[in-house]
């Protein structure tokens, strides 16, 4: 099963367009993180308490991720970072690591193939590389890794359709990867 964690603010924006081009003809679950609520992260590493409940949408999303074979993080580049909604979701991994119901969290994440789609407007193929590193390092902490990434260039609506490199790569991903 493929799960897309979409962190963009426009449902049909450039990031969504590029990601859907990759997935054309494949079955997938699209989770729009901007439509969900994530409470602030609770850091209990140095306390005697545990994470026993989530009073937001996080648990539903992480459970979906853990049932997936493939996960695609899809985000516009906002101020040289992934979107706040995607970052907030990733920050909650700290809670999952402290949740006794997810004792096998790292092992389960290691079995998933992760990919990243980014779209930005200010020299993104250079300036978005720290975003790639951010995701890669976060996954490495869990013993997982980023299998591939695609960075597209777009400033205005539908600009991504003029990024020949990104479109060709999206088509290649669509054929190459056994979604």
Annotate each language-model stretch with its function:
Residues 1-98, 103, 165-179:
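N-terminal beta1-alpha1-beta2 submodule of the flavodoxin-like/Rossmannoid cofactor-binding fold
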Residues 3-5, 29-31, 115-118, 147-150:
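Hydrophobic/aromatic beta-strand patches that form the interior of the parallel beta-sheet core
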Residues 9-12, 77-80, 121-125, 155-158:
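Short histidine/acidic/glycine/proline-rich micro-motifs that form metal-
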Residues 20-26, 133-179:
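Glycine-rich phosphate/pyrophosphate-binding loop and the adjoining helix
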Residues 34-36, 120, 152-155:
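Short, solvent-exposed coil/turn elements at secondary-structure transition points
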Residues 39-44, 114-116, 150-151:
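Short, basic/glycine-rich phosphate-binding loops at helix/coil junctions
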Residues 41-42, 127, 159-161:
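Short, well-ordered secondary-structure micro-motifs
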Residues 102-147:
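Short, glycine-/small-residue-rich phosphate/pyrophosphate-handling segment
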């Amino acid at each position: 099963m493929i799960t897309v964690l979409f962190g963009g603010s426009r449902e049909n924006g450039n990031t969504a367009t590029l990601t859907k081009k990759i997935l054309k003809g494949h079955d997938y679950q699209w989770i729009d993180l901007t439509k969900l609520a994530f409470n602030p992260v609770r850091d209990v590493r140095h306390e005697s308490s545990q994470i026993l409940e989530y009073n937001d949408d996080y648990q539903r999303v992480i459970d979906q991720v853990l049932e997936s074979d493939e996960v695609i993080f899809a985000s516009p580049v906002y101020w040289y970072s992934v979107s706040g909604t995607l970052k907030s979701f990733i920050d909650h991994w700290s809670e999952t690591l402290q949740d006794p119901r997810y004792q096998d969290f790292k092992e389960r994440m290691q079995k998933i193939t992760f990919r990243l789609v980014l779209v930005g407007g200010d020299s993104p193929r250079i300036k978005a590389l720290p975003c790639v590193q951010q995701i890669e390092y976060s996954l490495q902490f869990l013993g997982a890794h980023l299998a591939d990434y695609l960075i597209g260039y777009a400033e205005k609506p539908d600009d991504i359709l003029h990024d020949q490199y990104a479109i060709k790569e999206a088509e290649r991903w669509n054929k190459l990867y056994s979604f």
